[in-house]
Amino acid sequence: MHAMKKIFSFFVLAALLLTGCENSERVALSAEWFLNNQNETFLHYEYDPVAKEHSDAEHPLREMAALWAVAKAGNDLKDPELRELAEKGLAHFEQSFHEDDQWGYGYVRFGDGSVYLGYSAFAILSLLETDDPAKDELLKKFAEGILLHQNEDGSLDTIFYANHERSVDYYPGEALLAMMQLYNETEEADYLDLVERAFPYYQNYFAENPNTAFVPWQSQAYYEFYQSKPSQEVSDFVFEMGDYMVEEHDPAATCSQFDFSRGSVTAVYVEGMNKAYMLAEQLGDENRQECYGNFVREGIAAIEALQFLEDNNFGLEDYDKAALGGIVASDKNLDMRVDRNQHAVLAILGAMEAGLYP
C-alpha cells in the first residue's frame, strides 16, 4: 500500500508538470485557497469539497497560525490580496489581545478560554510580517510575556495562569522560533538568551521523548539560533532531530523512496527538514545534505499530490471554486482545513529558500 501511494504521488506530480502547472504556480494556488475561503472575520476553519460546505468549527490557534502563513505568503509573493486578508485577520485577532494587570505583558485569550503559549508565538510571527502601526509595542509586550514564563530549568510554561501543561511538543518550539525571528528583527539580547537557556531542557526532553511532532518547530528555532550563536552542540541537536525524522520515514535506510503515507502532516515535517538541509549545506555535510534534500523533494511531491486542482480532483467532478488549491487530508479524506494549507505554503516557501524547489 505504501509503495502504491508513492507511485501515485510521483505520477500525479509528473502529470501536473506536463499540463503546465509550474512550481511557482503551486504555492500561489495554495495561498489563493485562503482567499476563496474567507468569512466575515478572517477564514473558515474547515471546508468539505464533497458537500460544498464550510463547517461551523473553530480552532483559534490554527487560525492564528494561518494568519502568519497568509501574511508571509503575501510578502514573499508580493500579493496585495493576501496582504489585505492578513490585515483583516490581524484586526480580528487584535480584539483578543490583552495586557496582564500586574506585569503589563501581552497575551491572547479568546473569551474565557485558556491562555496558550502558542497564541503568543503566532501573534509575534504574524506581526513581524505586517505593517500594523502598533506592531513594535505589541511585539515587545508579547515577548515580555514569553520571557516571564520561562522557568529556572529553561522550560517554557505552555499555559499562562495555570499549573498544568499541554502541547509540550508544539508550543515551546513555536515560541522559540518566534523569539528567534524577533531577535533577528530587533537584536534584543534577552530574546536570544531565552532560546539559549531553553536549549539544554528541550535537548534532554527530545532524548527522553523522541517524536515527530517535536522536530519541525525545534529544528527551525535552533537553525535560526545557530546562525546567531553557532556551536557544535546546537548543530548536533538539529542533525539528531533530522536523522530521527529520516529514520521514521525511511525503514529501508536508503535515504530515498520515503514513506509519506501519513497524508497532509508531511508538510509539517518538510518545514523542519528544510532548515536541517540548509544547515547540512552550510556545514558541508554532504551525506546529510543529500539525504535531507531527498526527503524535502519527495515530501513536496507527496504534498502536491494532495492538492486539489482541476486535473487532480480526486474523482470529484462537481466542485466549487473554494476547493481549488486546497490540501486534502489524504487521498481518501478530502476534508480541507486552514492548517493544512498553512503548512503546505510554508513548506514550499521554505523549500524555495533552500534551493530545493526550483
Language-model features: locations:
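Extended, well-ordered alpha-helical scaffold segments
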Residues: N23-F34, K78-S96, P133-H149, T186-Y205, ...
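Bacterial N-terminal signal peptides
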Residues: S9-L17
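Low-complexity, Ser/Thr/Pro/Gly-enriched N-terminal "stalk/linker" regions
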Residues: C21-E63, A69, D76, P80-G104, ...
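CBM-like carbohydrate-recognition segments
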Residues: N37-Y47, S55-H59, E99, P251, ...
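Solvent-exposed loop and edge beta-strand segments that line ligand/cofactor-binding
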Residues: D48-M64, W103-S120, I159-P172, T186-E188, ...
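Active-site cradle of extracellular carbohydrate-active enzymes
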Residues: L35-Q38, F42-L43, K141-E174, A178-L182, ...
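Well-ordered alpha-helical scaffold segments within catalytic/enzyme domains
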Residues: M64-P80, A121-A134, E174-E188, W217-S231, ...
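Positively charged n-region of N-terminal signal peptides that target proteins for export
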Residues: M1-I7
